[in-house]
């Protein structure tokens, strides 16, 4: 019997009748390209570089009808649809549209959205019925499409992660709801891969042990088997299948991780070039950590060689941190340890932060002119972390790099 972990309701959920609306923009990057180039509508559109060894960033639903999916290699996508049209990624433009959409929703419907990524966000309502939540979701969905020409799918639940799962079930351009009391009927029949955190990397092991539906995870009471199949996060996955939350001994909700990876176009990078690329990827991930107002306790670095063999190293710190130099130093140490044992050329570099925790607002933060660039959500940052975030915000506001650290200047 399972008796090694505890279910609980997080402090912010206790004695509160909350319902979450989880917003997920449909094929967002492709939708923005279609919005700005109407001639691309109804054409098989792939966002990515046609002549690179990278992967499909996203694609529209016409391209998906050919079997093309996000994360698929460009070569495979071209095999499936030789006449596909390609658009280069323009992340600054996608962020601009994302900010506008979320801002319009907030101002029009007088609600606060917690923006989770460029194309995902969640709003929380207290003391309303599922029927009322559905009507609100329908109004938002239709308003955004009619006024901004972007399609969104919305999941509704009294459990945050179940709302996320059902936003995916609602695609494209739909609304799906599932209350915790209805999980046996609505959640359990779904494929187990619908639970966030169960990816393709371990799916063979999952299927081999007869976990196909969420129901299979929910009813399993063999803790040793669950740990073998799902690893260190099995308690959290199990809790989601039961519509509950999981806490460790420190009474903290186990958080999702942040990850960024990049497929290299040149397979002949020197170690010095690879370390520079690592720093660029790290900077992207660090910015996400800062914007989410969280600290992390663990880092994973992953390398994929040109023969598609994947290796990784991880480090779990004693204390939570958002210190730029400390996290970068650990990341580089893990990376170079991997390089020593990698005989083939490097094809992909990935970094993830895990075991995340929210940080409180620092009311004593300096209020100088430069600190106005720092979003109010950023809190209790170390001086080093604040400086790096400040540099990013200033450069972002001007549209190009006008400020950089002295140690990054060429001699």
Curated annotation (Swiss-Prot):
CDD domains: PolY_Pol_IV_kappa (cd03586). It comes from the Bacteria. One of its GO terms (molecular function) is DNA-directed DNA polymerase activity. Residues 20-199 form the UmuC domain. GO terms for biological process: error-prone translesion synthesis; SOS response. Transmembrane segments: none annotated. Belongs to the DNA polymerase type-Y family. This is Uncharacterized protein MG360. The lineage of its organism: Bacteria, Bacillati, Mycoplasmatota, Mycoplasmoidales, Mycoplasmoidaceae.
């Amino acid at each position: 019997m399972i008796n090694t972990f505890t279910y609980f309701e997080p402090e912010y959920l206790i004695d509160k009748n909350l319902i979450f609306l989880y917003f997920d923009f449909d094929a967002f990057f492709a939708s923005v390209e279609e919005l700005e180039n109407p001639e691309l509508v109804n054409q098989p559109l792939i966002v990515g570089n046609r002549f690179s060894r990278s992967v499909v960033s996203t694609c529209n639903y016409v391209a998906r009808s050919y079997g093309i999916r996000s994360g698929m290699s460009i070569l495979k996508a071209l095999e499936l649809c030789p006449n596909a049209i390609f658009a280069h990624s323009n992340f600054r433009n996608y962020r601009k549209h994302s900010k506008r959409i979320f801002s319009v929703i907030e101002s029009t419907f007088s609600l606060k959205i917690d923006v989770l990524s460029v194309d995902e966000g969640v709003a929380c309502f207290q003391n309303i019925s599922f029927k009322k939540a559905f009507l609100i979701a329908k109004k938002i969905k239709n308003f955004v499409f009619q006024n901004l020409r972007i399609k969104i799918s919305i999941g509704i639940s009294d459990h945050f992660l179940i709302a996320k799962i059902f936003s995916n079930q609602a695609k494209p351009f739909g609304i799906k709801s599932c209350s915790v009391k209805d999980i046996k009927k609505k959640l359990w029949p779904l494929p187990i891969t619908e639970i966030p955190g169960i990816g393709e990397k371990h799916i063979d092991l999952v299927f081999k042990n007869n976990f196909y539906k969420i129901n299979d995870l929910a009813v399993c009471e063999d803790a040793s088997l669950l740990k073998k199949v799902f690893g260190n996060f099995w308690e959290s996955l199990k809790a989601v299948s039961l519509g509950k939350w999981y806490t460790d001994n420190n009474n903290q909700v186990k958080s999702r991780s942040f990850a960024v990876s990049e497929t290299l176009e040149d397979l002949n990078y020197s170690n010095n070039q690879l370390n520079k690329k690592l720093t660029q990827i790290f900077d992207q991930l660090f910015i996400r950590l800062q914007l989410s107002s969280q600290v992390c306790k663990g880092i994973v670095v992953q390398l994929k060689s040109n023969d598609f063999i994947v290796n990784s190293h991880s480090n779990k710190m004693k204390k939570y941190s958002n210190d730029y130099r400390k996290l970068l130093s650990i990341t580089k140490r893990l990376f170079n340890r991997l390089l020593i044992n990698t005989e083939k050329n490097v094809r992909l570099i990935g970094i993830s932060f895990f075991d995340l925790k929210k940080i409180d607002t620092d009311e004593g933060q300096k209020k100088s002119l430069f600190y106005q660039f720092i979003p109010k959500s950023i809190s209790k940052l170390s001086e080093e972390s604040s400086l790096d975030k400040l540099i990013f915000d200033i450069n972002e506001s001007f549209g190009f790099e006008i400020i950089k650290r002295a140690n990054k200047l060429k001699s």
